[in-house]
């Protein structure tokens, strides 16, 4: 279930994502009903998450602490020393809470730096039950996540007949903190990951902005055997124009796409950011990912991330998840995604509406991640006789 804690859609998305797995902890019901409804700013979210992370850390609950440290870091700019402190604490607690699993970190050489990756070995029993499943699933990060958080999503799979690899590519997570900016040719870091792990074939799943990146990679990397967009992302810049009234979106989109005149874009975006916490965060994150400062330069850089040039280039079987309450991706983009994927070996679309399925209609189906990963897991193990979801995990 997607809970509207604060009434701010962006805040509520992050709170649902981070708090969902730990709502069963003692005292969480009181906090969600008495504290969260009073949150009105990003600084309040940072303070709330930091206090709660420190509490769980002191209690030895690393599984809860790592998620909250990432939430505490989420809205902070990269130059804030607290951000790195929170990220380091999140990584330490993640490692502690997963030390009993067949999971380890890797540092993948890439250009003049390196990519952070985590590999979780397949469950042997699941692999034996589903011999037709891909042997490896590479999960691609998005606009604001870290490799640990993507692996946290992987825990929702009801079974794991495949190794799971998550990584921070250029402009993502730990790699962005190290100063490596985002790059459009996503096939390059993808190839580096496949080469490092000596993989001839792997399925690929992209989360959020990763829903676009996985398509870009699949168009250029034939070693990708299956493609999952969790969920669809046709064009990154849609996330800036979608919150606007529908009547002005086309005009705004044309201005944003051109990012001209630069002086007007810079002035307008700077003023608008003061009135919108959502826009302020998107610009802050865009600067962090691209390494650019002026809003007009950031928009020009982000404009390269669109599926349009990929038409007819993606040949793999594809699964696309979509929801009409997605605050970053217009639901009507589904027709564009279908058109771009017309040459795919197969195309399965799972579309959800807020009227009938409100949790699944949200961005990345965040209101019901167990169900979302059951759907994606079943799709990945086909044509197995029994769906992955028939096995119950404790």
Show where each model-derived region lies.
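N-terminal cap/lid segment of alpha/beta-hydrolase-fold proteins
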Residues: 49, 80, 84-129
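Alpha/beta-hydrolase active-site loop
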Residues: 149, 179-199, 203
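Short alpha-helix in the alpha/beta-hydrolase fold that links the catalytic acid
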Residues: 153, 316, 330-340
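Conserved alpha/beta-hydrolase
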Residues: 157-174
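Hydrolase active-site cap/lid region
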Residues: 220-299, 321-322
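Short beta-strand/loop motif that positions the catalytic acidic residue
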Residues: 314, 320-322, 326
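Catalytic histidine neighborhood in serine/cysteine hydrolases
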Residues: 338-360
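Catalytic active-site module of serine/aspartate enzymes centered on a nucleophile-bearing elbow/loop
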Residues: 355-358, 362-394
């Amino acid at each position: 279930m997607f809970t509207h804690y604060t009434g701010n859609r962006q805040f509520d998305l992050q709170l649902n994502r981070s708090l969902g797995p730990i709502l069963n902890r003692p005292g969480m019901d009181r906090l969600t009903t008495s504290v969260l409804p009073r949150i009105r700013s990003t600084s309040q979210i940072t303070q709330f998450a930091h206090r709660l992370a420190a509490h769980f850390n002191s209690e030895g609950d690393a599984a809860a602490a790592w998620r909250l440290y990432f939430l505490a870091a989420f809205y902070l700019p990269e130059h804030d020393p607290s951000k790195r402190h929170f990220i380091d604490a999140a990584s330490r607690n993640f490692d502690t809470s997963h030390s009993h699993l067949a999971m380890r970190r890797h540092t993948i050489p890439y250009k003049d730096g390196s990519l952070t990756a985590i590999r979780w070995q397949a469950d042997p029993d699941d692999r034996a039950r589903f011999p037709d499943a891909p042997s490896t699933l590479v999960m691609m990060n998005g606009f604001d996540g870290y490799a640990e958080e993507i692996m946290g999503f992987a825990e929702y799979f009801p079974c794991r007949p495949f190794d799971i690899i998550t990584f921070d590519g250029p402009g993502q997570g730990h790699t962005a903190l190290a100063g490596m900016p985002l790059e459009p040719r996503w096939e390059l870091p993808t190839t580096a990951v496949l080469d490092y792990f000596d993989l001839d074939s792997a399925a690929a799943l992209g989360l959020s902005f990763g829903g676009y990146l996985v398509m870009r990679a699949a168009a250029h990397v034939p070693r990708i055997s299956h493609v999952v967009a969790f969920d669809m992302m046709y064009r990154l810049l849609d996330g800036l124009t979608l919150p606007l009234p529908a009547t002005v979106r086309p005009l705004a989109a044309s201005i944003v796409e051109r990012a001209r005149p630069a002086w007007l874009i810079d002035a307008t975006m700077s003023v608008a950011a003061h009135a919108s916490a959502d826009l302020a965060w998107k610009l802050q994150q865009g600067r962090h990912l691209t390494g650019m400062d002026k809003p007009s330069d950031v928009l020009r850089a982000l404009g390269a991330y669109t599926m349009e040039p990929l038409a007819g280039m993606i040949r793999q079987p594809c699964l696309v998840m979509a929801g009409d309450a997605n605050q970053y991706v217009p639901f009507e983009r589904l027709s564009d995604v279908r058109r771009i994927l017309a040459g795919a070996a197969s195309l399965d679309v799972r579309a959800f509406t807020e009227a009938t399925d409100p949790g699944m209609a949200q961005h990345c189906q965040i209101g019901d991640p167990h169900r979302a990963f059951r759907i994606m897991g079943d799709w990945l193990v086909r044509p197995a006789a029994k769906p992955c979801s028939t096995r119950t995990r404790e």
